[in-house]
Swiss-Prot record:
Name of the protein this chain belongs to: Ciliary neurotrophic factor
GO MF terms held by the record: ciliary neurotrophic factor receptor binding; cytokine activity; growth factor activity; interleukin-6 receptor binding; protein-containing complex binding
GO cellular component labels: axon; cytoplasm; extracellular space; glial cell projection; neuronal cell body
Organism of origin: Gallus gallus
Keywords, sorted A to Z: Cytoplasm, Developmental protein, Differentiation, Growth factor, Neurogenesis
Tissue: Nervous system.
Subcellular location: Cytoplasm
Amino acid sequence: MAAADTPSATLRHHDLCSRGIRLARKMRSDVTDLLDIYVERQGLDASISVAAVDGVPTAAVERWAEQTGTQRLLDNLAAYRAFRTLLAQMLEEQRELLGDTDAELGPALAAMLLQVSAFVYHLEELLELESRGAPAEEGSEPPAPPRLSLFEQKLRGLRVLRELAQWAVRSVRDLRQLSKHGPGSGAALGLPESQ
């Protein structure tokens, strides 16, 4: 019996998926609250439409049902690593702009950054259990983002938070699918099972 197929590995896999679902749900709830604070503090209209922004991963995926569990985990990991970088940039821009005078938005962004970092670690644990180590981050330091106007920074931040909320929903779906199967399952997980 392979190590990934042992009862203890299966139990750990299920536990990690369940905890991941709870983390993603909490993140979704918190990012929704953060969006409200962000829109208010930045003086934006909540209904404003923001086009796709370079570097912000989108949660939409074609052929979601055909993805394997490992593909789902790798997609999630890449997205949350990008969000970790984007949130750190947003936090730094916020601190440059307002310093420590903003007692609500800065701490909320910092808390979200911690949640995203914890979720990255959680996804890496799941990939380890899947008998596939987490890929190394592509570079230690991403290229510096182009200098944006204040308004462009606000719109990029809005897009980042909206997409993060969508990713949290997708992560719950992905982890639910993954939890239905044991560790190391490489088959497509979204397809209906014959009974």
